[in-house]
């Protein structure tokens, strides 16, 4: 490929927020870059868990605020399957049935960056006394490339004493803060992205 045909790269995907009992309020900061010598266009695709409501979105490009659209599960399904069929990420098959947020990213100027911010509110599911949070990190995708770093920092507060808190992801660090709280942090490089899964009671 010619030097100016470099794909868009995801240089940062960062999640911050808080959980109070069963309600999570999360903010996603997504940074992507055009490393080439010509304008490029991309598409931001972010899966939305069934228990999540999009409460805010901001992306300023060339001084103008860009809007996105919420796709219901039936619409999002064909996009997930299309990505899988091109062997970009077979793991996305597990997301079929979930909604998706989509936004066009244009223009991304040569050597330039664009920052998108999404805010979500989730009422977390509870089963057998266990509350579960799933943060879509691995599955965030740009139609023209991926890479960069991912990180998360989430504070947890509960009305009752926190008995158990664990994650299936070995990269997640959990720091207990008294009987009713904890801080969850996670940071990963450009390979092997995983979603953040957390269970507590």
Each model region followed by its residue ranges:
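Subset of Sec-pathway N-terminal targeting signals
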Residues: 1-201
